[in-house]
C-alpha cells in the first residue's frame, strides 16, 4: 500500500517539475541501522525503560489519544488499552532543553514558535512511548534489545532528519 503511494508521489513531483537531492524511505537500511544504533545508545544510557501504559486508543489511527482528543475528535472506534511498551525518559532532558533554547535564541525560528516550545516545556513533560508490541503492529523497525517490539513510527521517523544526511557514518 505504501509502495503505491510512494510511486504516485514521485510521478506527481515529476509532473510538477519538483526535484529533490535525495529520496529516503524509513524502510531503507541506511535509516533502520541508524535507528537501531540510537535505540541501543539510549538504552545503554538508561534512557529507555519498559513500563505498562493504559489509555484511550484509536483503532483507526493506531495511536493512543488524550481524553480531550477523544471528546473533540471524530474517532470511529476508541477503546481502553493496557499494554507494556518502551518509553524514552524525555522528562530527564526537560531542564536541559529549556536552558539550551534560552541560551541559543536563534535555535528555534520564528520566535513565536520558540515561545510556544518553551511554554510547552515549562509544563510537566511526560516520558515518550517509543514502541509497539509486534502482536499488535507487525511492521516497523524491530527493537535491537527486544524482538517482540517495533519502534513506534513517530520516534523512528523523526530520526530520518539526521539519518538522511548520513549521521554517524563515514560519509559525513
Q: How should these model regions be labeled?
A:
Residues 1-2:
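N-terminal glycine-rich dinucleotide-binding loop that anchors FAD/FMN and/or NAD(P) in oxidoreductases
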Residues 9-19:
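A glycine-rich helix N-cap at a beta->alpha junction
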Residues 14, 43-44:
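Short polybasic/polar patches that bind polyanions
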Residues 22-26, 30-41, 53, 57-61, ...:
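Structured secondary-structure scaffolds
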Residues 47-49:
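A short, conserved structural fragment
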Residues 67-69:
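Metal-ion-coordinating, acidic/His-rich active-site neighborhoods
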